[in-house]
Curated annotation (Swiss-Prot):
Gene3D superfamilies: 6.10.160.10, Ribosomal protein L20. It comes from Streptomyces avermitilis (strain ATCC 31267 / DSM 46492 / JCM 5070 / NBRC 14893 / NCIMB 12804 / NRRL 8165 / MA-4680). Belongs to the bacterial ribosomal protein bL20 family. GO terms for biological process: ribosomal large subunit assembly; translation. This is Large ribosomal subunit protein bL20. Binds directly to 23S ribosomal RNA and is necessary for the in vitro assembly process of the 50S ribosomal subunit. It is not involved in the protein synthesizing functions of that subunit.
Length: 127
């Protein structure tokens, strides 16, 4: 049986790690062990931040909706409550897009939400 030499595979693996680490500062781009640690951490950060991005965008959309709602004389939570009472299903992404790019349509939605709210918003819901 022929002897297996692993030099080609080892060099290929190390080269792949060092190429992935190009652009990092100092030893992290030049030494294999440091580069491997940093690439592993980078992949973990990448994975976690892809999950975090969803919440970050939702937070941004809510801030934009709240600012536009307050400009129209209503708060964010009352706007959402009124839209649910009026059975209007518009997600926050689209609401934020309307708030930024189409103020007239957003103002119309605020009007509908205002009319759908009960006069006493703290009154118990009718069953």
């Amino acid at each position: 049986m022929a002897r297996v030499k692993r030099a080609v595979n080892a060099h290929k693996k190390r080269r792949a790690i060092l190429e992935a680490a190009s652009g990092y500062r100092g030893q992290r781009s030049r030494l294999y062990r440091k580069a491997k640690e940093q690439v592993t951490h980078s992949l973990v950060y990448n994975y976690n931040d892809r999950k975090k991005r969803k919440g970050d965008f939702r937070q941004l959309w809510i801030q934009r909706i709240n600012a536009a709602a307050r400009a129209n004389g209503m708060t964010y939570n009352r706007l959402i409550q009124g839209l649910k009472a009026a059975n209007i299903e518009v997600d926050r992404k689209i609401l934020a897009e309307l708030a930024v790019n189409d103020a007239g349509a957003f103002a119309a939605l605020v009007e509908v939400a205002q009319k759908a709210l009960p006069s006493d918003v703290n009154a118990p819901k009718a069953a």
